[in-house]
Amino acid sequence: AVCGLGHAHPKIARALSDQGQTLLHTSNLYDIPHQTRLAERLCTLSGMDNAFFCNSGAEANEAAIKLARLKGNRAGNHTPSVVVVDGSFHGRTMATLTASGSRKVQAGFEPLLGGFVRAPFNDIDAIQAIADNNPGVVAMLVEPILGEGGIHIPDSSYLTALREICDRHQWLLMLDEVQTGNARTGRYFAYQHSDCLPDVVTTAKGLGNGVPIGVCLARGEAAELFVPGNHGSTFGGNPLACAAAHAVLDVIEEDGICAHAETQGRRIVETLRTALAGNNAVKEVRGMGARARR
């Protein structure tokens, strides 16, 4: 999920070396051209309007949760909650481990934070029931494909149905693409396999190919929630991390990585299904692009 383009990729290594000889870090009080251009590229790829840069997927998801709480509080809802799903993983900060649907991740860190409502993954009826009975909900945070939960791919209509529920109830639909983004599933983002356009998208891991970087992307109302002083990051979007991310995006585009991941992923799944057919120890082979599990 991190070094999707391999180790010591020559283009990325060269970009890091070149940037390292000029400017590694500067205050974000100044205009950082690399950062501005990267924000523009990511917004174009995702259909979002704004980008908040940080250093990891957990930080990006933390920013998304803060956006949701800001939305609620500014509307007079001082106990806003976010819908999350069983089996999910969103990080190891207090907010993101609470949002995660894994007791293993949460164990020993009680008391967990409030403000989250849980539902089964890939269960639209459960989400609708929450919408009907929980007026304090302001957003839903979900992975398009459950990662740590076992590479579970939802029904093809799942994200579209979530989008409809969120629209009806004025929730933000926030997608955690930390593991599925950056061409890993055969599209730049996994939600692009559907007609769904979220309000918030988080990405990290493969965007830096080993260099720490995370991004919380937002559009529409969600893009206007943060104002100066609401949130920040000392190192987020620094010139070195942005140089790495630009090189990653260049390679993904120039080498046709999305199409390659889709083709190779299909081949891997088909090969595994054939090789493991009749093996009683194997229940199912699941995968999309360069993500597979048996």
What positions do the PLM features span?
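Conserved N-terminal phosphate-binding loop of PLP-dependent enzymes in the Aspartate aminotransferase
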Residues: A1-R294
